[in-house]
């Protein structure tokens, strides 16, 4: 008896347990343009066939459960079930497979990343038949993309707001991340912005602690950026972290930032949650605020190669939920990030249409149908010697964020900012003149340091600093 006829009410209820693959493994299925497609890295328990493991993932993340239930006869499983439509072994890995699963669009609430993830990466990750499970990629169909607002403003609108074109934007995370008073914190912000940076940033765990309450920080930072704007003639911003213990408190902080007239606020989207993030993104669009996103907690989810969720999926989810910037790794700094894979999800953040490219970890062609793009933020262990590589790798539509690489300058914060701005302008000019940044990068920085004592001092301090560890996030 076929799985389809078993679920028809006219046949009668047949109790018991049957293999998932009888119903949920459908290798002849032709995917629809409206399906959400998922690529899972599956490691079955010994003795579990890969087809059964893939079917179990499809079942437990859609309509299935561990046994046959009589209420199956009250609906059409063929309409609503997830289907494992293909399985392929992972090259070079024993007992690992990529299982491709198609989900009907009707399974998901419109405009809700929360609901999408609750289904696709919910209970199935604790399933006993699987030794490990990792969601490698999702194809979000245009029909579903169109139910999301996405980033509050996007790349072009941000450039127009800031009146800054033709180069990456420069930022700095204020350090020490915890312990400064609000006034001293604001002083550090002012010095960095006056020196030539476009942005400064609250660190991800700066919320509203006893040593510095959020309202005091917002006031002193607003004073700092307005003073720096008046002195430099450039529009400046500070990422005021609105993350809070409740959505109501988060929105209250964003409202106060808007009343101060600052251009941008910030949110920790994984610890804060997708529902809170989408709510804040909607507020930011309605009220003209840019939204910077920090990915605190991402490595808990994405760093293990065989279990969890790859960051490219979290990046796609952020573009849907809403954010104008997101931290994306550096390739060259202290934090995890392999070049081809990093550039793969950077393209998924910025571009409107991205072709399937397995060499960069992109399992599906993704059409964003004009959903605004997100600026990738390179941050973590970078300094002036990295500037040529960062400019070449990330291009103009990016934010290069130097925390210790600004505040660690031997002459202070403002000279540290000057050094970074001079290095960036030198790299952009050299690139525009046709020079090869990858090959001539060090020479370009040395030439610029001859007429910038601030850059020369920075070059001397960080000439021996390297973070040489093998990346774990490989294909």
Swiss-Prot record:
<feature type="binding site">
    <location>
        <position position="203"/>
    </location>
    <ligand>
        <name>Mg(2+)</name>
    </ligand>
</feature>
<dbReference type="InterPro" id="IPR036422">
    <property type="entry name" value="RuBisCO_lsu_N_sf"/>
</dbReference>
<comment type="similarity">
    <text>Belongs to the RuBisCO large chain family. Type I subfamily.</text>
</comment>
<feature type="binding site">
    <location>
        <position position="295"/>
    </location>
    <ligand>
        <name>substrate</name>
    </ligand>
</feature>
<protein>
    <recommendedName>
        <fullName>Ribulose bisphosphate carboxylase large chain</fullName>
        <ecNumber>4.1.1.39</ecNumber>
    </recommendedName>
</protein>
<dbReference type="InterPro" id="IPR000685">
    <property type="entry name" value="RuBisCO_lsu_C"/>
</dbReference>
<dbReference type="InterPro" id="IPR033966">
    <property type="entry name" value="RuBisCO"/>
</dbReference>
<keyword id="KW-1015">Disulfide bond</keyword>
<keyword id="KW-0479">Metal-binding</keyword>
<keyword id="KW-0113">Calvin cycle</keyword>
<feature type="active site" description="Proton acceptor">
    <location>
        <position position="175"/>
    </location>
</feature>
<dbReference type="GO" id="GO:0000287">
    <property type="term" value="F:magnesium ion binding"/>
</dbReference>
<feature type="binding site">
    <location>
        <position position="379"/>
    </location>
    <ligand>
        <name>substrate</name>
    </ligand>
</feature>
<feature type="active site" description="Proton acceptor">
    <location>
        <position position="294"/>
    </location>
</feature>
<keyword id="KW-0150">Chloroplast</keyword>
<keyword id="KW-0120">Carbon dioxide fixation</keyword>
<keyword id="KW-0601">Photorespiration</keyword>
<dbReference type="InterPro" id="IPR020878">
    <property type="entry name" value="RuBisCo_large_chain_AS"/>
</dbReference>
<feature type="binding site" description="in homodimeric partner">
    <location>
        <position position="123"/>
    </location>
    <ligand>
        <name>substrate</name>
    </ligand>
</feature>
<keyword id="KW-0460">Magnesium</keyword>
<feature type="binding site">
    <location>
        <position position="327"/>
    </location>
    <ligand>
        <name>substrate</name>
    </ligand>
</feature>
<comment type="function">
    <text>RuBisCO catalyzes two reactions: the carboxylation of D-ribulose 1,5-bisphosphate, the primary event in carbon dioxide fixation, as well as the oxidative fragmentation of the pentose substrate in the photorespiration process. Both reactions occur simultaneously and in competition at the same active site.</text>
</comment>
<comment type="subunit">
    <text>Heterohexadecamer of 8 large chains and 8 small chains; disulfide-linked. The disulfide link is formed within the large subunit homodimers.</text>
</comment>
<keyword id="KW-0456">Lyase</keyword>
<dbReference type="GO" id="GO:0009507">
    <property type="term" value="C:chloroplast"/>
</dbReference>
<dbReference type="Pfam" id="PF00016">
    <property type="entry name" value="RuBisCO_large"/>
</dbReference>
<keyword id="KW-0602">Photosynthesis</keyword>
<dbReference type="GO" id="GO:0009853">
    <property type="term" value="P:photorespiration"/>
</dbReference>
<keyword id="KW-0503">Monooxygenase</keyword>
<feature type="modified residue" description="N6,N6,N6-trimethyllysine">
    <location>
        <position position="14"/>
    </location>
</feature>
<feature type="modified residue" description="N6-carboxylysine">
    <location>
        <position position="201"/>
    </location>
</feature>
<keyword id="KW-0007">Acetylation</keyword>
<dbReference type="Pfam" id="PF02788">
    <property type="entry name" value="RuBisCO_large_N"/>
</dbReference>
<keyword id="KW-0488">Methylation</keyword>
<feature type="binding site" description="via carbamate group">
    <location>
        <position position="201"/>
    </location>
    <ligand>
        <name>Mg(2+)</name>
    </ligand>
</feature>
<dbReference type="InterPro" id="IPR020888">
    <property type="entry name" value="RuBisCO_lsuI"/>
</dbReference>
<dbReference type="InterPro" id="IPR036376">
    <property type="entry name" value="RuBisCO_lsu_C_sf"/>
</dbReference>
<feature type="binding site">
    <location>
        <position position="204"/>
    </location>
    <ligand>
        <name>Mg(2+)</name>
    </ligand>
</feature>
<feature type="binding site">
    <location>
        <position position="173"/>
    </location>
    <ligand>
        <name>substrate</name>
    </ligand>
</feature>
<dbReference type="GO" id="GO:0019253">
    <property type="term" value="P:reductive pentose-phosphate cycle"/>
</dbReference>
<dbReference type="InterPro" id="IPR017443">
    <property type="entry name" value="RuBisCO_lsu_fd_N"/>
</dbReference>
<feature type="propeptide">
    <location>
        <begin position="1"/>
        <end position="2"/>
    </location>
</feature>
């Amino acid at each position: 008896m076929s799985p389809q006829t078993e679920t028809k009410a006219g046949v009668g209820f047949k109790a018991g347990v049957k293999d998932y693959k009888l119903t949920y493994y459908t290798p002849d299925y032709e995917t629809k343009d409206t399906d959400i497609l998922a690529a899972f890295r599956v490691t079955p328990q010994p003795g579990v066939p890969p087809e059964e493991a893939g079917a179990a993932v499809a079942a437990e993340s859609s309509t299935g459960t561990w046994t046959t239930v009589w209420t199956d006869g009250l609906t059409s499983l063929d309409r609503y079930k997830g289907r494992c439509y293909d399985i392929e072994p992972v090259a070079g890995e024993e007992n690992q497979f990529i299982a491709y699963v198609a989900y009907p669009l009707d399974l998901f609430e419109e405009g809700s990343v929360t609901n999408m993830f609750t289904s696709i990466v919910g209970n199935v990750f604790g399933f006993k038949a699987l030794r490990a499970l990792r969601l490698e990629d999702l194809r979000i169909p245009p029909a579903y993309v169109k139910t999301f607002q996405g980033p509050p403003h996007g790349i072009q609108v941000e450039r127009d707001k800031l009146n800054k074109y033709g180069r990456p934007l420069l930022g700095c995370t204020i350090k020490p991340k915890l312990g400064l008073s609000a006034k001293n914190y604001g002083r550090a912000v002012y010095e960095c912005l006056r020196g030539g940076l476009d942005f400064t940033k609250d660190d991800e765990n700066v919320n509203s602690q006893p040593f510095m309450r959020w309202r005091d920080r917002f006031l002193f930072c607003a004073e700092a950026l307005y003073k720096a704007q008046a002195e430099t003639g450039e529009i400046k911003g500070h990422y005021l972290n609105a993350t809070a213990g409740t959505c109501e408190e988060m929105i209250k902080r964003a409202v106060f930032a808007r009343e101060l007239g600052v251009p941008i606020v910030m949110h920790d989207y994984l610890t804060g949650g997708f529902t809170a993030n989408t709510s804040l993104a909607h507020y930011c669009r309605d009220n003209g605020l840019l939204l910077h996103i920090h990915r605190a907690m991402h490595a808990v989810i994405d760093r293990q190669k065989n279990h969890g969720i790859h960051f490219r999926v979290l990046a796609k989810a952020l573009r849907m939920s809403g954010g104008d910037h997101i931290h994306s790794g550096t390739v060259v700094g202290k934090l995890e990030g392999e070049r081809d894979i990093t550039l793969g999800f950077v393209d998924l953040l910025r571009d409107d249409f991205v072709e399937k490219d397995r060499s960069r970890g992109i399992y599906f062609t993704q059409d964003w149908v004009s959903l605004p793009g997100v600026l990738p933020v390179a941050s973590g262990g970078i300094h002036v010697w990295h500037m040529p590589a960062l400019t070449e790798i990330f291009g103009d539509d990016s934010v290069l964020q130097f925390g210790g690489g600004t505040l660690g300058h031997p002459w202070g914060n403002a000279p540290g900012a000057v050094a970074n701005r001079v290095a960036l302008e030198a790299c952009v000019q050299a690139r525009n003149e046709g020079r090869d940044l990858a090959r001539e990068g060090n020479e370009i920085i040395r030439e610029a340091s001859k007429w910038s004592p601030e850059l020369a001092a920075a070059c001397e301090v960080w000439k021996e600093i390297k973070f040489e560890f093998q990346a774990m996030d490989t294909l």
